[in-house]
Amino acid sequence: MRVILLGAPGAGKGTQAQLIMEHFGIPQISTGDMLRAAVKAGTPLGLQAKDIMASGGLVSDDLIIALVKERISSSDCSNGFLFDGFPRTIPQAEALLEADVHIDHVIEIHVPDEEIVARLSGRRVHEASGRVYHIIHNAPRVEGHDDVTGEPLVQRPDDHEATVRKRLAVYHEQTEPLVGFYQKLVAEGKVKAPKYTRINGIGSVDSIRQQLLDVLR
């Protein structure tokens, strides 16, 4: 079970990724975690990445792909894996294909932009405890105040509407083209083409989870 999960920030990928990992017993692989682990372990690839990052450079796609191949050869990936935030661009997806890294499923969790803006910009947080509210879906008993302590709630900078819209713009420019890339692979009947599925990301966590499980079974 080798899965790539796509979707805009705020589409609910993190929640569903956790459920997939637990259900199928596969690890979630993020390039950030992978880089940090390789650097800490002092592997040859990790040392290369460390030198590049220390000089302020960007780690090349070739090195990322080499790290990916190294990571998925680990025993915990024997039953599969879930890529988190990778690939981000078409060149990375092409490199993954050329490196003969087989993917079974590419699943896009689709949520319209305005719904994502409403989801994220409506969040309010009690900083001391980490309790999260939403002005519409999970409002505090007293507007703007934590239910337990009565202390003021804050809106995190990442949740400001302008910031959310900027993140969505980056997603549409850099990552959304991957949807077309994988759809084209399927349409052309490529041998290595994964199964591509778009699911509706509006609904309860359980209903979206069921859609995912129906696809992955």
UniProtKB/Swiss-Prot annotation:
AMP binds at T31, R36, G57, L58, V59, G85, F86, P87, R88, Q92, R156, R167. Residues 122-159 are annotated as: LID. Its EC number is 2.7.4.3. It is found in: Cytoplasm. Gene3D superfamilies: P-loop containing nucleotide triphosphate hydrolases. InterPro entries: Adenyl_kin_sub (IPR006259), Adenylat/UMP-CMP_kin (IPR000850), Adenylat_kinase_CS (IPR033690), Adenylate_kinase_lid-dom (IPR007862), P-loop_NTPase (IPR027417). The keyword Transcription does not apply. SUPFAM superfamilies: P-loop containing nucleoside triphosphate hydrolases (SSF52540). Residues 30-59 are annotated as: NMP. The keyword Cytoplasm applies. Its main location: cytoplasm. It catalyses: AMP + ATP = 2 ADP. Pathway: Purine metabolism; AMP biosynthesis via salvage pathway; AMP from ADP: step 1/1. Disulfide bonds: none annotated. Keywords: ATP-binding, Cytoplasm, Kinase, Nucleotide biosynthesis, Nucleotide-binding, Transferase. Coiled coil: none annotated. ATP binds at G10, A11, G12, K13, G14, T15, R123, V132, Y133, G203. GO terms for cellular component: cytoplasm. Catalyzes the reversible transfer of the terminal phosphate group between ATP and AMP. Plays an important role in cellular energy homeostasis and in adenine nucleotide metabolism. Monomer. NCBIfam families: adk, PRK00279.1-1, PRK00279.1-2, PRK00279.1-3, PRK14527.1. This is Adenylate kinase. It comes from Cellvibrio japonicus (strain Ueda107).
